[in-house]
Amino acid sequence: MTTQVVNVIGAGLAGSEAAYQIAKRGVQVRLYEMRPVRQTPAHHTDKFAELVCSNSLRANTLTNAVGVIKEEMRLMDSVIIRAADECSVPAGGALAVDRHEFAAKVTEYVKNHPNVTVMNEEITEIPEGPTIIATGPLTSPDLSAQLKELTGEDYFYFYDAAAPIVEKDSIDMNKVYLKSRYDKGEAAYLNCPMTEEEFDRFYEALIAAETVPLKEFEKEIFFEGCMPVEVMASRGRQTLVFGPMKPVGLEDPKTGKTPYAVVQLRQDDAAGTLYNIVGFQTHLKWGPQKEVLQLIPGLENAEIVRYGVMHRNTFINSPNLLRPTYQYKQRDDLFFAGQMTGVEGYVESAASGLLAGINAARLVKGEEPIVLPPVTAMGSMANYITATNAKNFQPMNANFGLFAPLEKKIKKKAERNEAYATRALETIRNFVNI
C-alpha cells in the first residue's frame, strides 16, 4: 500500500465520492470540510453531501442520460448512488431521497472508512502533494482568491436557487390530486390545478413580488436547470405554462380535463410529511414569497418550513484548465471535481468526484489515469467540460447530446436513447475493476 496521502478539500457530493473511491483503493485520504467550523449561506448541517437545492437526483430510467450516468456509477460502486438508493422516497420515474437520511448515510460510509481521516478546518491555501479540490459553488473567499491566482482566470458567477418546502398537513387535499405525468411510475406528485383566471392572478403577483437585491459586483447569469421562477416568469406569461407549470399528462381525475396550469409538489422526506414545490426555486423575499405561494390552489394555508433561497455558484473555465481526467493541466497531482468544473447537477458532480478519485488513487500508485470514452455518460461529461469552446463555456447537465454519435443513425428518439444507454453500459463494464 502506498504511503502517500491524497488531500480532498470539500465533503459535498463530489468530495465525498472522491474520498471514498481513493480510500477503497488502499490509499490514505485527508478529507477537509470547513463545516461546522465555518458555515456557508446555503448549508444548514455539518453532514457530508448535504443537498441544498432539491431532494431529487432526477431521472432513474435508462431513457434519460442522467439515468444512464447513475447506472454507470452503480456499476462503479458509487457511495453517493448507493446511499441514494437506500434513502429513496417515492418520486415516479425519478430518484429522490430523504435528504437528512441521505447525508447521514454518506457521512457514515465515508467517515467510517479506515483509510479516511476527516479534518474539520478551512483550507485557505492549495496544499502541496496529491490534492482534489471539490469545494463546490460556495468556495470560501480565501480559497477562491488562491484559485483565481492559480488559474489566472476570472470566475463566473450565477445563482442556484432552492425551492420552498411545505408541510403536507397544511395542504388542502380536497383541491389537489395524486398523479405522475402520463401516469409514469407510481402516482408520486401532488398536483395543484389552476384555471386560466387563477393562473393570471398568480402570474401578476409573481412578477410584481419583491426579490432580494443582488450585490453590484455579481452578474446575473442563471443556469437554465435551476432558474428562479420569477426570472422565468419575466420572460413571458407562457414560459411557466410550458415550463414548471406545464399541465400536459396531468389530467384532473375529478373533471377528466387537463387544467390550464399545474403546480407539482414532490415528497421531500421519507416520512412523507414535507413536500417541495417542483421547479419553484426563487429569490423572492420571504413575505412576498408566502403571499405568492398561497395563491396556488391547495396552498392557501400552506405552512412553509423552508423558504426558497438563492446562493452564488462558482466555476472555472475547465476547457482551458483541465484534462478529461479532471487533472489540472499545469500540475499533474492537482485535480478538480464537482460543480466547480462546470458539470451541473448533483449526480454529475458526484460522477466527476468518482472519476477524479479513481485517477488520484491511480496517480499515487504509479498507474496511468483513465479517460472514460465519450460513449459513456461520465466520459461525455468529462469530454464536454474539457473539449468545448472555452470562450462560451457554461455549466451542463448530462444529456444524450453530449454522447459520441451512434455508428448508425436511429430516427426514433426512444430507440436512439436506448442504443446510447446500451452502448454506454457495455463500455463502462470494461472499467468496473480498475
UniProtKB/Swiss-Prot annotation:
Ranges in coiled-coil conformation: none
Gene Ontology, cellular component aspect: cytosol
Keyword presence, Transmembrane helix: no
Primary localization class, coarse: cytoplasm
Superkingdom of this protein's organism: Bacteria
Catalytic activity: uridine(54) in tRNA + (6R)-5,10-methylene-5,6,7,8-tetrahydrofolate + NADH + H(+) = 5-methyluridine(54) in tRNA + (6S)-5,6,7,8-tetrahydrofolate + NAD(+); uridine(54) in tRNA + (6R)-5,10-methylene-5,6,7,8-tetrahydrofolate + NADPH + H(+) = 5-methyluridine(54) in tRNA + (6S)-5,6,7,8-tetrahydrofolate + NADP(+)
A GO term for molecular function: tRNA (uracil(54)-C5)-methyltransferase activity, 5,10-methylenetetrahydrofolate-dependent
Residues the record lists as binding FAD: G10, A11, G12, L13, A14, G15
E.C. number(s) listed in UniProt: 2.1.1.74
Cofactor annotation: FAD
EC main group: transferase
Subcellular location: Cytoplasm
One GO-annotated biological process of the protein: tRNA methylation
Keyword Transcription: no
UniProt KW keywords: Cytoplasm, FAD, Flavoprotein, Methyltransferase, NAD, NADP, Transferase, tRNA processing
Record-stated family: Belongs to the MnmG family. TrmFO subfamily.
HAMAP family: TrmFO
Record function comment: Catalyzes the folate-dependent formation of 5-methyl-uridine at position 54 (M-5-U54) in all tRNAs.
UniProt-recorded name of the protein: Methylenetetrahydrofolate--tRNA-(uracil-5-)-methyltransferase TrmFO
